[in-house]
Amino acid sequence: MERSPFLLACILLPLVRGHSLFTCEPITVPRCMKMTYNMTFFPNLMGHYDQGIAAVEMGHFLHLANLECSPNIEMFLCQAFIPTCTEQIHVVLPCRKLCEKIVSDCKKLMDTFGIRWPEELECNRLPHCDDTVPVTSHPHTELSGPQKKSDQVPRDIGFWCPKHLRTSGDQGYRFLGIEQCAPPCPNMYFKSDELDFAKSFIGIVSIFCLCATLFTFLTFLIDVRRFRYPERPIIYYSVCYSIVSLMYFVGFLLGNSTACNKADEKLELGDTVVLGSKNKACSVVFMFLYFFTMAGTVWWVILTITWFLAAGRKWSCEAIEQKAVWFHAVAWGAPGFLTVMLLAMNKVEGDNISGVCFVGLYDLDASRYFVLLPLCLCVFVGLSLLLAGIISLNHVRQVIQHDGRNQEKLKKFMIRIGVFSGLYLVPLVTLLGCYVYELVNRITWEMTWFSDHCHQYRIPCPYQANPKARPELALFMIKYLMTLIVGISAVFWVGSKKTCTEWAGFFKRNRKRDPISESRRVLQESCEFFLKHNSKVKHKKKHGAPGPHRLKVISKSMGTSTGATTNHGTSAMAIADHDYLGQETSTEVHTSPEASVKEGRADRANTPSAKDRDCGESAGPSSKLSGNRNGRESRAGGLKERSNGSEGAPSEGRVSPKSSVPETGLIDCSTSQAASSPEPTSLKGSTSLPVHSASRARKEQGAGSHSDA
């Protein structure tokens, strides 16, 4: 039984946070200085770490001591709050028998004043012992010396978590090395007005970054084929940073509701920062923010890889595109693996400045291995490949130095790559510098905060603290600015005259289409196609291409309405010389034997009637000029003979596969109609393609036949 106080003292030893040795200290509490002992030891039974806090807590029981409800009440309180410490390193605790007597004598007064007996002083927790208290040798002569020494060299017992920062339950919280302790919220370094300014700044920058990255992505959607490999990773890179900027904007809107825990008045807990993955909202924000931050960095590395393959290894776009599956596997797989690992390790931390959740804000090891190390690795690999690619491009530029045009293009491309890489690397390297600076000085900042608030929170103050070692708000603002501005560099790559043209065309296409303008455009495209195709045929014939030439025309419907009334004669102005086109058409007809036979049939079948039929049906009202009966009969006969020879002229501009007569007569027909009649013609008539390959003699013969009729 005699060893029970010593065993209890051994149990209390782990409570000593900053003790390196078990030492006694002189009593400084005035009420207990008249006791038979003058040395004490902390922490005591209630977990008090110094005599000042113990004296304050003991003051709640002074009413009992002043009323002297029990003759031994004052001695018991001093032994409980200021325990005895002997030179033999023996902590003496109050006895159970004395405790039971005090409670029995003072129970009525405690009920009257509403005093609650502390759980730490329950009598059944105290040891059975005698009431004799050992006294240190020379109690009054040795008191002044150690007391002065204590004033000169204060005892550093480490950090004690304030009561309002303690967390309930097993949530895995850890702050300044203390379990179940969380940082305060709002931020422990800055004032409220500084935090408001920082939040507004982050919100504005996130909006700019979000708009820039969305513009890059939407430009890609307008013309997907424009951004092929090796440039395609820029699009995925911009998508990643659009999500990052969106998360910061969400944090700006929500404030600290996601990054901080609300105060609990019942448990006497204040606002604390979220630590761990138990908070679902904070975990979701962390997943998106960390995953896409790392994915964006990896996509930049892949961009440098594709540039190196194209410039240094001379890979084609198709060869690089075949490796796209591996690019996606690395870019999305590695960040996903790190994100899942951090969630499993319970490393999620709330950021009470920006309102988001990230990693490494209070855990220095997590910041070192999950933020700094991946970013430094990506910068090293990407910068190495980028320099290798630029060196290869410079070598190519020296090889083609006599080709002024290509050399100028290559020079502009190199400048473009250099500026884009600089816009990415400079902010990223600055961000790494902020992380390193914060990692080195965070412990000092925390000790300064500890020293500034120890008296306010009634916790022991640190032995040494530099009052000037406080963080600057500008450092954190630069860190958030560099985090977001990295995504804006993608706008530089897509920002060109071609992008403006694509956006202008996109808005123009979305307007309501005019049927007249649309049908004119269709006709103009058809004429341009015929002219281009005939030029190719002439080129082949000039070089002695064997066999007859045939023009196979495929008419394509543009979805326009044939009921609209318009005049398409002016659309033929796109072709400058239709006489040349007619000459080429005549040449093509005579090169084919089958076409010669068909031409003879057409002569016998009254060719002018066929021509009048073609142009007349397409012209609409102008067909009344050939309204006699004989003209109709000859027209019908010509139609019959043409149908027997598989040369029926379709009304919509199509030519039979067996016909070697090209459909180029539309130009002459439409032009002549536009000149002769100002009345608008139907769309059906304007899109028909009559034959314009008859000779001058045939025209004269047709004119004579028409006059006879």
Swiss-Prot record:
Cytoplasmic face of the membrane: 223-233, 306-324, 392-416, 495-709
Chain ranges for the short sequence motif Lys-Thr-X-X-X-Trp motif, mediates interaction with the PDZ domain of Dvl family members as given in the UniProt record: 498-503
Record has Transmembrane as a keyword: yes
An example molecular function term from Gene Ontology annotations: Wnt-protein binding
GO cellular-component term (any): plasma membrane
Regions that span the bilayer: 202-222, 234-254, 285-305, 325-345, 371-391, 417-437, 474-494
Start and end residues of each stretch annotated as Disordered: 583-709
Cellular location(s): Membrane; Cell membrane; Cell surface; Apical cell membrane
Residue ranges, Extracellular side: 19-201, 255-284, 346-370, 438-473
Domain FZ: 19-132
Observed effect of gene inactivation: Half of the males without the gene, but not females, display abnormal claw morphology or absent claws compared to wild-type; at the age of 2 to 3 months, the claws disappear or become rudimentary on the hind limbs. FZD3 and FZD6 double knockout embryos have a curled tail, exhibit defects in neural tube and eyelids closure, in the orientation of hair bundles on inner-ear sensory cells and die at birth.
Basic and acidic residues compositional bias, start-end: 596-616, 630-644, 697-709
Topology of the protein relative to the lipid bilayer: Multi-pass membrane protein
Pfam family for this entry, one: Frizzled
Family the UniProt entry places it in: Belongs to the G-protein coupled receptor Fz/Smo family.
Function of the molecule: Receptor for Wnt proteins. Most of frizzled receptors are coupled to the beta-catenin canonical signaling pathway, which leads to the activation of disheveled proteins, inhibition of GSK-3 kinase, nuclear accumulation of beta-catenin and activation of Wnt target genes. A second signaling pathway involving PKC and calcium fluxes has been seen for some family members, but it is not yet clear if it represents a distinct pathway or if it can be integrated in the canonical pathway, as PKC seems to be required for Wnt-mediated inactivation of GSK-3 kinase.
Protein name: Frizzled-6
Organism expressing this protein natively: Mus musculus (Mouse)
